[in-house]
Amino acid sequence: MKKNITKTIIASTVIAAGLLTQTNDAKAFFSYEWKGLEIAKNLADQAKKDDERIDKLMKESDKNLTPYKAETVNDLYLIVKKLSQGDVKKAVVRIKDGGPRDYYTFDLTRPLEENRKNIKVVKNGEIDSITWY
C-alpha cells in the first residue's frame, strides 16, 4: 500500500511539473506573440503618420508650385521613396544652395537608419534634383 501511495505522489508530481512547464511555455509564447503584434501595430501606425505627413508636404508644394521641401533627413527619405518608380535601389538628392554638404544618398532597399532620422537638412531643405541609380 505504501508503494502505491509513493508511486501516486511521484506520478502526480511529474504530471504537475509537466503541466506547469507547458503553461509557462504557453504564457511565454503568447507573451512573445503579443509583443510582436504590438510592434507590428506601432510600425504600421508610424508608417501611416509618415505617409500622411509626406502627402501633406507634397500637396503643399504642388499647390504653391514650389520645389519639395524637407525639414529632416527622414522627410527627405520618405519623399524620395514615394517618388521612386520601378526597381530603383539608390537615390542621391541635391539640396538647393546647400554648399559642400548639399547632397544626401539613400539606399531604398532598406529602411532609414534610426541615427539619421532626426538630422536637420541643410539650408531651407528645397530639393534641387534627385538622381536615381
Curated annotation (Swiss-Prot):
Its main location: secreted. It is found in: Secreted. Residues 1-28 form the signal peptide. It comes from the Bacteria. Pfam families: FPRL1_inhibitor. Transmembrane segments: none annotated. Keywords: Secreted, Signal, Virulence. The keyword Secreted applies. GO terms for cellular component: extracellular region. InterPro entries: FLIPR, FLIPR/CHIP_sf, FLIPR/CHIPS. May be involved in countering the first line of host defense mechanisms. Impairs the leukocyte response to FPRL1 agonists by binding directly to host FPRL1. Belongs to the CHIPS/FLIPr family. NCBIfam families: PRK13033.1 (NF009592). This is FPRL1 inhibitory protein. It comes from Staphylococcus aureus (strain NCTC 8325 / PS 47). The gene is flr.
